[in-house]
Design a protein with these regions (language model features):
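Conserved structural motif at the start of ABC-family nucleotide-binding domains
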Residues: 2-4, 17-19
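Helix-to-loop junction immediately C-terminal to a conserved catalytic motif
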Residues: 48
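Q-loop/switch helix immediately C-terminal to the Walker
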Residues: 69, 74-93
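Conserved ABC ATPase "signature" region
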Residues: 92-106, 125
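Conserved ABC ATPase signature
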Residues: 110-119
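Hydrophobic anchor residue at the start of the ABC signature
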Residues: 123-124, 162
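Walker B catalytic motif
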Residues: 138-139
Length: 197
């Protein structure tokens, strides 16, 4: 269970979101929506434990967070990256992840040679290998339609198996999950803009 009550998050020492209350049970997902700069990434970083809450309470399990960088080890192959992350979290590598994320043909390629879309697929598969709840920031970025469809297929299976996910998106996401519009929770807009300075 991931739950927040009266949560406020900050960026650069200034609150950007406030008054957030939500709960995501096992098997559930929450889609975060809002314009650029509203605080979607700041909220995900707080849920991941990378930044403390500014105010309110937060109950969050250890989760796997995918930001804007892929986090792969460039000298390791695709398969070695997945094996590394699975073992780091005390799990065997699920070989089906290579097929689920269309990485099987790339298994022996060094991660540093992948295209942006291939690297994004590896980043998402790497998180899937951890077996943890997922916090995904723009998960469809750099993915073509076929790759996005594969991700959504895997994500639905993850949720059906009791997994949990929070996803920040700009566009439409073909996922049956409640959405939270962050715009009404924006703290002082001038303070939010100053957080980028």
């Amino acid at each position: 269970m991931l739950a927040a009550r009266g949560l406020a998050v900050a960026r650069g020492g200034r609150p950007v979101l406030e008054g957030l209350s939500f709960a995501v049970p096992p098997g559930g997902a929450l889609v975060l929506r809002g314009p650029n700069g509203v605080g979607k990434t700041s909220l995900l970083r707080t849920l991941a434990g990378l930044a403390p809450p500014w105010a309110g309470t937060l109950q969050a399990p250890d989760a796997a967070y995918a930001g804007h960088l892929d986090g792969a080890k460039p000298a390791l192959t695709v398969q070695e990256n997945l094996l590394f992350w699975a073992r780091l979290h005390g799990r065997p590598l699920d070989p089906s992840l290579l097929d689920a994320f269309a990485l099987a043909p790339l298994r022996d390629r060094p991660a540093g040679t992948l295209s942006a879309g291939q690297g994004r697929r590896l980043a998402l598969a790497r998180l899937a290998a951890t077996g943890r709840p997922l916090l995904l920031d723009e998960p469809l970025a750099a993915l073509d339609r076929a790759s996005a469809d594969r991700l959504l297929l895997w994500l639905r299976a993850h949720l059906a198996g009791g997994g949990l996910a929070v996803l920040a998106v700009h566009g439409d996401l073909a996922l049956d999950a409640p959405a939270l519009d962050l715009a009404p929770h924006a703290a002082d807009p001038l303070g939010a803009e100053a957080a980028f300075l």
